Amino acid sequence: MKLKAIILATGLINCIAFSAQAVDTTITVTGNVLQRTCNVPGNVDVSLGNLYVSDFPNAGSGSPWVNFDLSLTGCQNMNTVRATFSGTADGQTYYANTGNAGGIKIEIQDRDGSNASYHNGMFKTLNVQNNNATFNLKARAVSKGQVTPGNISSVITVTYTYA
């Protein structure tokens, strides 16, 4: 009987000792499912060069067009890329000049011959070919009326979406 009591007591002590040492482990699995994107150009600087007040004899006069490209590469498993343009508007089809030259607004157009203007909120969609897409664009300054000397500046943001 004493032996049974000792064995029972030892078993209870072992159960208590092991249950006191139990610790939970939590496994957390995380990750992200992303849409693959193209390699996009960083900031693009388009210089209109030196322009003169006399280049703008009346409202609507424009500077020479300056061509530039937005070339996207590595567009794997994509059919189309949409570029949406946004910035501070000046009227319905132009961007505001935030520089100190007076009477100037900025125009962005497609170089495909359509003369499509890409003002605030407008977009252009291209088909991806060989994992690449290039937006061929042009920019110029346009007179709103009397032009005064100063610098020209306008920041236009392009947001890309893929399909």
From Swiss-Prot:
Residues 138-144 are annotated as: Involved in sialic acid binding. The keyword Signal applies. InterPro entries: Adhesion_dom_fimbrial, Adhesion_dom_fimbrial_sf, Adhesion_dom_sf, Bact_Fimbrial_Adh_Pro. PANTHER family: FIMBRIAL SUBUNIT ELFA-RELATED, PROTEIN FIMG. Fimbriae (also called pili), polar filaments radiating from the surface of the bacterium to a length of 0.5-1.5 micrometers and numbering 100-300 per cell, enable bacteria to colonize the epithelium of specific host organs. Belongs to the fimbrial protein family. Gene3D superfamilies: Fimbrial-type adhesion domain. One of its GO terms (biological process) is cell adhesion involved in single-species biofilm formation. Disruption phenotype: Deletion prevents hemagglutination (erythrocyte recognition), although cells are still poorly fimbriated. Keywords: Disulfide bond, Fimbrium, Signal. The keyword Magnesium does not apply. This is S-fimbrial adhesin protein SfaS. Residues 1-22 form the signal peptide. One of its GO terms (cellular component) is pilus. The lineage of its organism: Bacteria, Pseudomonadati, Pseudomonadota, Gammaproteobacteria, Enterobacterales. It is found in: Fimbrium. It comes from Escherichia coli O6:K15:H31 (strain 536 / UPEC). Disulfide bonds join 38-75. Its main location: other.
